[in-house]
């Protein structure tokens, strides 16, 4: 075998020419200490705030404290297998999650990993979890209604698309029930063909029991609402960093719809638990505590989250993101730190009371303390026409009821006012998972404010309402169609409605 020098040199030249110097360079650090879901890492000198880092075994973390000689990292997962001296790798990416319509009908964790066993998530793009809220110029005032299907809310405390309305109350007062009803009520809109009317929902469960989240998913599925809903779950057994991240992940999912000329609704259930998780992380990272041991930036935590809910103007696609944050109070104390913070950030609050709940007023909305700072611009004209009176009458009723306890000899006008108020309060009661269409609410409230209930015993009001709606649906569907299409009660419609309600009231017994 003879060796050909020319051939060998040609091969060597080719190999030298083809030599690739694309070595993967990733900056690494070392774990100094680890415990309670926090790792102190030495050596990641160029790491960015909020950047994802990777520990051995694929566990991820997020760099939060950038100090002179070390980096404080919160760990998204178990820290059991991480030990001192382990290498930590920078990923170069700020925390992001998959977003898009491919997530509808799914249950995911705050990093976008599926939890429902329905396979991988298809057809999505990735977005950063913590982004800046839209400025003042791209926004528009809130003017389209976001119907919850609950008479007490749609008539008295209307919510508009792009609004942030806080649901606040003690434990077991029906806060989640209101939010779930609002999601269920979007079913007719989402089954229609009008993309401008559809409202995609995101339910964020923070620090709740897994059984509760499973129950909510089952309720949504049984009512046909899961197909337009995404559930983001960071349950009680998940580490604090995931509970802290969950609302931001849910908001990012909603922003996809807002920025693509669609409409989103995001429910944060509840932000008290997010604040507790953030407090835990901050104290373990040795950040100085403030009032109630919360860190100084806990206000900014919630404000930067809730400011991302917005109604965008025509140049930006006219999309919207509505937020329903939930806060749990202790013994009706609305003046605690987190409740006052969130009340001051949101555009109104729905205040639920234990006493009302146990008196059988459900939803247990305290109409006196609840407000919507968007007001009637978030109502259709028909609802404004009937709901204007009910607000005034209920306010007078509450005032009179307080005095009426002391005196038995009341004049006829006061007695009439008390009777009407008691019946209107009864009229606003509603069962769970039974939202009403807005035109049906208008008919019912019309009957209430025009005195058709005044002669009835209070106990019969619920039956009257159901029978009236049944009668109108079967015998006078034109009235409901007119209110739905015209969005107001014209003189012609009012005449028909008046005669229909009068005839029904005479026959009702």
UniProtKB/Swiss-Prot annotation:
Gene3D superfamilies in UniProt: 2.40.30.20, ATP synthase alpha/beta chain, C-terminal domain, P-loop containing nucleotide triphosphate hydrolases
EC class: translocase
Predominant cellular place of this UniProt entry's protein: membrane
Binding site for ATP: 169-176
Cellular compartments annotated: Cell inner membrane
Catalytic activity: ATP + H2O + 4 H(+)(in) = ADP + phosphate + 5 H(+)(out)
Name of the protein this chain belongs to: ATP synthase subunit alpha
Species of the source: Parvibaculum lavamentivorans (strain DS-1 / DSM 13023 / NCIMB 13966)
Lineage summary: Bacteria, Pseudomonadati, Pseudomonadota, Alphaproteobacteria, Hyphomicrobiales
